[in-house]
């Protein structure tokens, strides 16, 4: 019988509003935007410094690591490349599924300053024809920003919707990382060769961008 997780919570005041982090001793379970601000999409304006508003005593190490990672991200996104990632223990990461495979590929392959299309991410996850399933995986992402579903865009460059806080939040995150919007996805252009390009061109079943 699986052991029930003893959940703990903490709150971070970020440039996007208050964010709730949830997790147990074994890993992070979720990142949730509690109250949205109207993000300033001007990338030349420095974001407000994030502030930890507190939580229960004895915050598990995965929440401590996630807080440190998010604080660094909101100060300077590139600085997160050298930081440890918290262990992840949401049920979606405990199941052998295409959703888990997509989320892991997105986390490990699509780095700061890059974007990827639904079709490209489907190919990276092993099924080039599963672009619509990738859209479903983005909606199921329990840890947005950490697993960067905001970097997943349509093939034509349209950014689409964003279940992690809405289109304005997605635009802010892309601008914060210095990623231009309205341009084709940048991932794969020399990463995996011509097989990716041919796979993308042979599939047309791309979701409407509601992730």
Curated annotation (Swiss-Prot):
UniProt keywords, alphabetically: DNA damage, DNA repair, DNA-binding, Metal-binding, Methyltransferase, Nucleus, Phosphoprotein, Transferase, Zinc
Annotated GO biological process: DNA alkylation repair; DNA damage response; DNA repair; methylation; negative regulation of apoptotic process; positive regulation of double-strand break repair
Sites of Phosphoserine modification: 14, 205
Entry keyword DNA repair: yes
Catalytic activity from the UniProt record: a 6-O-methyl-2'-deoxyguanosine in DNA + L-cysteinyl-[protein] = S-methyl-L-cysteinyl-[protein] + a 2'-deoxyguanosine in DNA; a 4-O-methyl-thymidine in DNA + L-cysteinyl-[protein] = a thymidine in DNA + S-methyl-L-cysteinyl-[protein]
Domain of life: Eukaryota
UniProt binding sites for Zn(2+): 5, 24, 29, 89
Protein name listed in UniProt: Methylated-DNA--protein-cysteine methyltransferase
Organism of provenance: Mus musculus (Mouse)
């Amino acid at each position: 019988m699986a052991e029930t997780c003893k959940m703990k919570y903490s709150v971070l005041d970020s440039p996007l509003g208050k964010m709730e982090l949830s997790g147990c001793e074994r890993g992070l379970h979720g990142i949730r935007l509690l109250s949205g601000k109207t993000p300033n999409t001007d990338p030349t304006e420095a974001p407000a410094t994030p502030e930890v508003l507190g939580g229960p005593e004895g915050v598990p190490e995965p929440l401590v690591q996630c807080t440190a990672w998010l604080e660094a991200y909101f100060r300077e996104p590139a600085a997160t490349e050298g930081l440890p990632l918290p262990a992840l223990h949401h049920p979606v990461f405990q199941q052998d599924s295409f959703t888990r495979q997509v989320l892991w590929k997105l986390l490990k392959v699509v780095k700061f300053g890059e974007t990827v299309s639904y079709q490209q991410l489907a190919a990276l996850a092993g099924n080039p024809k599963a672009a619509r399933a990738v859209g479903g995986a983005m909606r199921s992402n329990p840890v947005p920003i950490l697993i960067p579903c905001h970097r997943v865009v349509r093939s034509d460059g349209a950014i689409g919707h964003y279940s992690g806080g809405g289109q304005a939040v997605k635009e802010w995150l892309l601008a914060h990382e210095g990623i231009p919007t309205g341009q084709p996805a940048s991932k794969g252009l020399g990463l995996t060769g011509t097989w990716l390009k041919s796979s993308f061109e042979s599939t047309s079943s791309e979701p409407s961008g509601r992730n």
